[in-house]
A protein has these predicted regions:
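Substrate-binding N-lobe of the ribokinase-like
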Residues: 28-90
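Conserved beta-alpha-beta core of the PfkB/ribokinase-like small-molecule kinase fold
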Residues: 134-189
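Short beta-strand segments
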Residues: 5-8, 59-60, 85-87, 96-98, ...
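Positively charged, low-complexity intrinsically disordered leader regions
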Residues: 1-24
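Hydrophobic/aromatic residues located in beta-strands of well-ordered beta-sheets
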Residues: 3, 55-57, 164
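Glycine/charged-rich beta-loop-alpha catalytic/anionic-binding loops adjacent to active sites
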Residues: 22-31, 105
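Conserved phosphate-binding/catalytic loop of the ribokinase/pfkB sugar-kinase fold
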Residues: 86, 96-131
Length: 189
């Protein structure tokens, strides 16, 4: 059995630590941290750390940010098989500004993903699926993505005899539910 983790809209998570955020002033950053992010990547890292089954990741990465993302994930979890689909657009970033009292998040929305790249992702995924495998699809969709793409992915997974867990919200969650996803974990994000 292999655990396949799809992150539709991955991001490099950047955390800036400051003493105190003062609006409309220069804030000196004490510490900067970069890590590969996205709900599906977090699932993959946890599954890899558990060590009970091989883990593979899928999604869309592009540009120099995509290269950095792969390097960061390799450093944190070298056992994960990275099977990303290459996109033209830069991989997005999320920014967290942390001080002693609060955290402020700035999340880029990411770039639209053409249908042809979704088809590549599905072909890449199904080429690696076996009947006892599990697939997780976790997180938000890139902008302008038809939420019924999750129904297409669920159907392809079931056609291969594998099972699927969906962790998302809104119309994408409903599309996956109507397509017969095996497990749904609705969320508000």
């Amino acid at each position: 059995m292999t655990i396949h983790c799809i992150t539709p809209n991955p991001a490099i998570d950047v955390t800036y630590t400051v003493d105190t955020v003062v609006l409309q002033k220069v804030n000196r950053v004490r510490e900067v941290a970069h890590r590969p992010g996205g709900k599906g990547v977090n699932v993959a890292r946890l599954a890899d750390a558990h060590g009970s089954a091989p883990v593979a990741t899928y999604g869309f990465l592009g540009g120099t940010e995509g290269v950095l993302f792969k390097e960061l994930l390799d450093q944190l979890a070298p056992g994960i098989d990275q099977r990303w689909t290459e996109a033209e657009a830069q991989t997005r970033r999320t920014i967290a500004v942390v001080d002693s009292a609060d955290t402020t998040m700035l999340n880029e929305s990411g770039a639209p993903v053409p249908q042809s790249l979704w088809e590549q992702l599905i072909a890449n995924l199904t080429a690696h699926l076996a009947s006892k495998d599990w697939v997780t699809i976790s997180g938000s969709l890139p902008p302008q993505t038809d939420p019924t793409i999750f129904a297409d992915i669920v159907a392809a997974i079931h056609d291969a005899g594998a099972r699927v867990l969906i962790d998302t919200s809104g119309p994408a969650l409903w599309a996956a539910a109507r397509a017969g996803a095996d497990i749904l974990t609705p969320n508000r994000d």
